[in-house]
């Protein structure tokens, strides 16, 4: 299987680079939940460790606590990562602060992570809004608090993206903060249906599944000015496939392994990219 991906990458490189090798290909590698197969996902320890190992772009997830604080967690329950079956959205910040992950790390909150990033050489952070069960009133509070917490602390030159599977969250964020950069996430591959949804939302960033995404679909998306993030990225081979398909962003659970592999074996690739909309 690995040989297939080597061939894919080499073929794409040869086909695209009849000019000198200086025409480096670019793809932004981001650490999914900090790089969840390499670190204690979505804890401060995860981001510190991956940053110290060269990662400069991230995805993370957030939910609203019972006292309207923003907590960093993918699952509503802490059972999988902390070993306790409690609902983060039904507890206060003070109550959540009592828990330690299975690896001994405390619950992380958005203001703490934003502060950590504030003086770092961060290129890109995707703040994924977990909001499917929120009322319109909660959504407004959630989006406004998120924007006002992270944007004042954004490092100069960094790109902060507000993303969600919940299109209501995207529309609410844009209503409250028209300058916000938003991304729609879907479990579908890049396809006409997804491109139509982006047009409906008036958003030009999308996170799609790498499975069943084709080069033709990627070409069509890029012709429409869409920036594409392909996921999941469970291994180095998934990164190679994302690159071969022409992704702008590869969302990876093993970002350090990907960066090291690319440095040693895919020297024509720059693992960062200007992701501003043109």
Language model segments and positions:
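Phosphate-group recognition and catalysis centered on beta-loop-alpha active-site segments
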Residues: 16-278
């Amino acid at each position: 299987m690995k040989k297939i991906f080597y061939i894919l990458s080499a073929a794409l490189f040869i086909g695209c680079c009849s000019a000198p090798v200086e025409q480096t290909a670019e793809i932004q590698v981001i650490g999914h939940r900090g790089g969840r197969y390499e670190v204690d996902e979505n804890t401060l320890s995860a981001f510190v460790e991956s940053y110290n190992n060269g990662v400069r772009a991230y995805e993370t997830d957030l939910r609203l606590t019972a006292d309207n604080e923003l907590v960093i967690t993918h699952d509503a329950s802490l059972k999988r990562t902390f070993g306790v079956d409690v609902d983060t959205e039904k507890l206060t910040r003070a109550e959540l602060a009592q828990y330690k992950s299975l690896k001994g790390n405390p619950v992380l909150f958005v203001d703490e992570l934003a502060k950590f990033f504030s003086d770092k050489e961060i290129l890109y952070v995707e703040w994924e809004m977990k909001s499917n069960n929120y009322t319109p009133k909660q959504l407004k509070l959630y989006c406004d608090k998120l924007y006002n917490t992270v944007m004042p602390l954004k490092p100069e030159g960094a790109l902060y993206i507000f993303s969600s599977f919940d299109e209501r969250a995207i529309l609410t964020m844009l209503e409250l903060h028209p300058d916000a950069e938003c991304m729609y996430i879907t479990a579908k591959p890049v396809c006409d249906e997804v491109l139509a949804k982006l047009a409906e939302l008036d958003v030009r960033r999308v996170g799609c599944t790498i499975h069943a995404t084709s080069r033709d679909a990627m070409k069509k998306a890029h012709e429409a000015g869409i920036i594409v993030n392909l996921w999941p990225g469970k291994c180095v081979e998934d990164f190679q496939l994302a690159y071969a398909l022409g992704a702008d962003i590869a969302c990876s659970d093993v970002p350090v392994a990907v960066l090291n592999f690319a440095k040693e074996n895919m020297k024509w690739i720059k693992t960062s990219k200007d992701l501003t909309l043109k």
